[in-house]
């Protein structure tokens, strides 16, 4: 017979509170009857929960502090400081007193014990960049505003006006093209870079042409040796007495 596995139960749920207006305290006790809602019954005040309460109910009960316990916060070193009274708290309307600067004395004058603080200065490069940026932004604002107040170019000294003569016309002459045009054909040799730009078919065509040229040169040299006269001479040389068996 198989052993029945024991089912694990979680923590028990707390019981529902009593009727409205009745809260379990140290001076009350929750009792329940079968088939009825829990009833809160008052109990005499005591220093702790009644002994008949369960552990779960003791956690829910509120035990008021006794007047005999004099726990002072000064006994605990890690206790937070006590909150100030409402009158001592600074309000938003009341201005806070400003602390004097480190170089100032109690009366507002210079304190001889503290040396005077140096004025804050930017690095040279950062100051130059900020100045150039500010000038650029100012020019942009003037340009967007319509050019009002834009810096004007320096005025050139006035030159005396020369009277117009018939030899020098007032209007500039236009460009005129000659009716005689010469066309010169320039010969440009195809380089390796140009062949590479044209593609592989151009290189293959050049290789085929070079191969045909070399074959023609070889035929011009070897052709006479393969004719009938050359064959007859070769056979006569080979049939001599020195080569006979």
Curated annotation (Swiss-Prot):
Q: Where is this region: Interaction with host EIF2S1/EIF-2ALPHA?
A: 215-230
List where the motif Nuclear export signal lies.
Answer: 122-131
Q: What is its main location?
A: host cell
Q: Where along the sequence does the record place the motif called Bipartite nuclear localization signal? A: 197-215
Alphabetical keyword list: Host cytoplasm, Host nucleus, Host-virus interaction, Inhibition of host autophagy by virus, Inhibition of host innate immune response by virus, Inhibition of host interferon signaling pathway by virus, Inhibition of host RLR pathway by virus, Interferon antiviral system evasion, Modulation of host PP1 activity by virus, Repeat, Viral immunoevasion, Virion, Virulence
Q: What does this protein do?
A: Inhibits the establishment of the immune response and of the integrated stress response (ISR) in the infected cell. Plays essential roles in viral nuclear egress to mediate capsid transit across the nuclear membrane. Facilitates nuclear egress cooperatively with host C1QBP and protein kinase C/PKC to induce lamin A/C phosphorylation and subsequent reorganization. In turn, lamina disassembles and nuclear egress occurs.
Q: What is this protein called?
A: Neurovirulence factor ICP34.5
Organism per entry: Human herpesvirus 1 (strain MGH-10) (HHV-1)
